Amino acid sequence: PSLSGQESDNIVLLLMSLPHPSADVVKSIEGAIKWFQKSEIKGIQKEYFTNSDGKKDYRMVPCEDCPTLWARFYDLETNRPFFCDRDGIKKYDISEIGHERRNGYSWYNKDGSKVLKRYEKWKKEQNK
């Protein structure tokens, strides 16, 4: 089990699309926005390279002024991003998982940005 920086975005966008949301829906949206804000990952980006086996690979490297990212999975207790191979064992550094899973899965995304942007508009609409 985990929190998700990818699947959660569409759920929150759906909730914000509801006309006349109930107090519970508003509370859920506000809670989700706080989570997206506290879960932002800044200062890293993908760098592609050819690994020692001659395969295309990537690693996360520091960067300035790069887009904010969210991890695919966050630990339920610590909110720390984690990654895993097909065995499901949590790893806290993407370089610790195998090439196949690292390159065959979307571990980082920018989807939270559209949620936060839409939230600003939604909040204004709610205050009318």
Which residues does each predicted region cover?
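Terminal, non-catalytic domain-edge segments
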Residues: 6-128
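Intrinsic, low-complexity N-terminal interaction/targeting segments
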Residues: 1-2
